[in-house]
Every structure is written in C-alpha cells, then in structure tokens.
C-alpha cells in the first residue's frame, strides 16, 4: 500500500459513525467506567488493569524497513526491522477490526512544547481510558489549534486485536509497529498504555536530531534565576524524586528536547511510578492523583475504592498519568533556557562509583553513551535482584538513530553553552548490594543542590584511581568519608576487586562504539 491508500483507509475509519473525537475528561471518565473498562477510585481517578502486559514489550516492537529511512536507522535488538508487506496486511486487518467496534475515541494534540519543532499527532483508541491517558499525557490543543489541526503522525491502538504470528509475521500476538514513511504507529495485543507514550517519544527521537535538536530521556527543572538543570537516569535511579524540588519549577519529568532556543518538554503530562507511594515521600505525585488522573494496575478495594500503593500484586510497575498542570510548581508552557547543570543518575549496585563526581566533556560523552545503572526489581518482568545494565544515552529502547548521533550533539551543546555535567550515584555505598547500604536520599539531595547552585564549580577534587572521575573533596552537609567510595568500604581489597570488575564491564560494553573518537574512549573511560 502506498501512502495515499493508507491515508484513504484512515480517512474512511475517521468518518465512521462510531467515532468520538476530542471528548472531555469527564466524558472519557464516564465512558471508561460505563463500558466496564475501568473504575473510579475514592480520589476520583480512573483506575484500569492492563491484563497480561504490565510493562512495555520491547521484543514485539518493530520499525518498517523503508527505502526513504532504512539507511538512517540503527537496526538491531531495539530497532527490529519488519517488511512493508507485514505492516500493510496488519494495518488493513486492524482498520477493519476498528470499523466493527461500537465506539472509537480520537485525541488530537501535539508532541513538543516548542512551537518551532512541534509535532501534530492524533491517537485513535479502542478504549476510552487509553484515550484519556493520551489526552493527559500529550499536549492538549486550544480551540483555535484544534480547528486547524492536521496530524503529522497517527497512533492506532487496538489492544483486543491479536496478531496470529504464523499468518501475520510477528513474534507474538502483540505488536508495536512504526512506519516512518507512512507516519503510522500500529499497536495491538497489549493494553499497557505506556506503549503509546514511548512510541511517540521514539518518533521525536528520530525527527528532532535532524533539525539540530537533541532529544533526551530526562527530567528538567528551572530555578528562579532561570538556571536549568537536566536529570538523566533509568528507572529507579531517582530522576522523578530529585527533579521534584520545592524551590525549582518543573519543566517536565521524562522527555525533553534541547534546541537553539533552550530546553522544552515533549509532553503535556507525567507518567509516574506509584509503588510504595506516600504523601510524605512524594507529595507532588500523591496530590496529583485525583479526578482526571489515570491509574494503571494499582491495587484498589472494590468497595471503598481506596488504593493500596504498597500492593504490587499485579505488578511492581504501577503507574499514574496526569497533566503536568496537576503539579503546582511548574513552568507553563513547558519551555526554558539552556541548561547550566546536567546530572547523570546511576544506581550502582556494585557500590564503587562516587556519590558525586564532576565530568569533563569526554567523560560526559563516554558515560552518556554507556548509560550505566543497575536494573532494579519491578521495572521489568522477572527482575528480582539488581543486575548491571548499560542503556545507551539513558534511553536505548527509544532511540532509532545511532547512539553516537545523540552523544555528539550532547558534546556540541556542552561546548556551546558551558554546561557542567555530574555523575551521581544513588545506589550503594560501603559495600555492594547485600552488604553495603543504599545512599541516603538526604545526602544525594544535598550534593545535587550544591551542584545546581554552582557550589561545586571551583571546588577541589581528587581523581578516582580506577574510573578517572573527579571527586569533590568536600560538600557541605555530607560526611567526607561518604564522598570517596573506597573510604566508605571497610574492606579496601574487596572494594578494589569490585571496582576492577565494574571497570571491566564498562570497557567490554564500550567495544560496540568502534566509530567514536579516540578522545572519548581514552579520556572518558576507566583509567584501568
């Protein structure tokens, strides 16, 4: 099928009698509950279960191999190729399936708060609660914007349509297929709403760098003086917690672009973890759970409708989606200037990385490409003990282009705007996981605040003998023995052995970046 035929099929679907376009939040909440998709909690949130899939399905995600784009994509485990024929056949089947539904729901909106690079999107849903999720997560249009809205990309989500692998050419009944040429994202066989969010992020990670804009998997906030800070880190490293600061305004919690204008949020909402959530620990998220919010897989009493955020019986990956306006202390619209401080967060279960260290540009690019952390229980199915993981650019599942494209852009931006990068270990200290202890959040907050306030810009440092990292000798409010990881271990020989082991893992992982400059490898990585 060519793009015209694809568009005609889509037009026919959207002109059907079963279409609900741009319903309001109360209308979607009503639909979700009356159709038996979800229930209302005592706080007024819409709560749904996602069945078998309570997280992303990376093995079922494909990109169509197309002449116009195939030479740009970094093909492999993340970007799995699939043929146009497979896409076309599934597209026809999904459209036919959706035409036969009693009701469909359409959201029209945007990705990217910077008007210069904004992407117009539409999301077509089988479920009303999925459409409410899209309404709250993406950027909502004004009446004027809606009147002239023409979608650049369309997400089509049909969770109850299941592929037949033997016939349809997929690996399982589930599929997330992106056609960059036809500007369609086709999702079937999974009810996990996060697939919609991350598929649009993937599109932005493809489009923005081609406009000279660095797309980033990070949270961002800004101080009263306009000083912007970015927080990179994988699940469980403290990105959301550390960027929620009462003295700084939130730009966004997960996806951003960095253009010549500054930093902007790609989304219009937040998608936060709720496992073990409490009003004391994370008041901003807790207070955002109200009418209009969408809860995923959170345990709830069927009679009182009171949520139990400590109950991970359905999954540890319980979530809430809400518009960013549900957070009090935000920048609206979600745009700000150029970052002064960049924080790379890692949860090191080896317990050997410093709690904070200053990075040179080469080290920043090296650690950005490495994207090291320890995978913690609950972020993916089957993970019960922390295990080391390297996720390129702190977001490899969402990067269609070669990693070096993003790393080189980061290096250029650091040079252009004089940003200082810090590596912050929120993981273990005084020993590895099981013998050491988790870094105190109060210490991490103090160190991050000192970095953002510029107190570490000219501080005296010592160089770590294994990783070459520059460790501040003093940070007010943090014991000096905590700052140097080797000093925090009682058994120095055990520390040396663990540090050497992790350095070896870094070196082994970095072999896949054969085409990066020698300066990044030699000046950025471990000394041993």
Swiss-Prot record:
GO CC field: cytosol
Positions annotated to bind substrate: 56, 192, 198, 319
Binding site for ATP: 198, 217, 233-241, 282, 319, 444
Catalytic reaction annotation: oxaloacetate + ATP = phosphoenolpyruvate + ADP + CO2
Main EC class the enzyme belongs to: lyase
An annotated Gene Ontology molecular function: metal ion binding
InterPro entries xref list: PEP_carboxykinase_ATP, PEP_carboxykinase_C, PEP_carboxykinase_N, PEPCK_ATP_CS
Cofactor note: Binds 1 Mn(2+) ion per subunit.
Protein's cellular compartments: Cytoplasm
Binding site for Mn(2+): 198, 217, 254
Family: Belongs to the phosphoenolpyruvate carboxykinase (ATP) family.
HAMAP family, sorted: PEPCK_ATP
PANTHER family xref list: PHOSPHOENOLPYRUVATE CARBOXYKINASE (ATP) (PTHR30031:SF0), PHOSPHOENOLPYRUVATE CARBOXYKINASE ATP (PTHR30031)
Function: Involved in the gluconeogenesis. Catalyzes the conversion of oxaloacetate (OAA) to phosphoenolpyruvate (PEP) through direct phosphoryl transfer between the nucleoside triphosphate and OAA.
Official protein name in the record: Phosphoenolpyruvate carboxykinase (ATP)
Gene from which the chain derives: pckA
